[in-house]
Amino acid sequence: MAIVKCKPTSPGRRFVVKVVNQELHKGAPHAPLLEKKSKSGGRNNNGRITTRHVGGGHKQHYRLVDFRRNDKDGIAATVERIEYDPNRTAHIALLLYADGERRYIIAPKGVSAGDQLIAGALAPIKPGNALQLRNIPVGSTVHGIELKPGKGAQIARSAGASAQLVAREGVYVTLRLRSGEMRKVLAECRATLGEVSNSEHSLRSLGKAGAKRWRGVRPTVRGVAMNPVDHPHGGGEGRTSGGRHPVSPWGFPTKGAKTRGNKRTDKMIVRRRK
């Protein structure tokens, strides 16, 4: 994987930094694992904007990724290829199981075409294998972690993400997340060893607004540039600072205000994130 800084042959190329991976598959994705992905433009069934800054972008297909890996225990799989996925920052790996079935998984770092992976209690401790947390040694790095047994991976799924298993006590294990949070998870839950691929994703620079539009992201207008009818920060004679602590268009505090409201799982958090 290489970091390529483009030559400033035009204003749009001047700040472009690309992450080039020669191992990525250059052909079409595996068609049986594709699904139609329709665009909403951020609108709901009434045609009203419910998510701002969404719209346009290149047409995409959704790749069906196996986040559970719980119904192929003990069946060896060969990594056929590593692919780009427009729906996520991580790369995906196409597995060919010994029973002939193919599935996509989130590609772990260091896994390449031809490698053998397996899931289940007897799986060896190596990157890409999926086991229950009770069978993973303390100190191991994991990703794709379940919060409920059988529900599928929910934590550490994006590019370069991982967590460290720091303790095991009774029916729970304790994980240290990248945010600094220490959290208890049921030892029955599954996780994949290693960290997620494409950790260089954060080093890239799109270089121009148009590259963001290709990805379906529309511009963000500052509140102080709006009229009072549109935003609490709007209006005023000349340029203003908004005149109050930063709020959303609906008046809720933003820029650092705590938004976590799930008290039900507070007991699982040993230490809050930094």
From Swiss-Prot:
Biological process (GO), any one: cytoplasmic translation
Compositional bias (Basic and acidic residues): 263-274
Keyword entries, A-Z: Ribonucleoprotein, Ribosomal protein, RNA-binding, rRNA-binding
Region: Disordered, residue numbers: 28-55, 224-274
Subunit composition and interactions: Part of the 50S ribosomal subunit. Forms a bridge to the 30S subunit in the 70S ribosome.
PANTHER family: LARGE RIBOSOMAL SUBUNIT PROTEIN UL2M, RIBOSOMAL PROTEIN L2
NCBIfam families registered for this protein in UniProt: rplB_bact
Protein name: Large ribosomal subunit protein uL2
Gene name as annotated: rplB
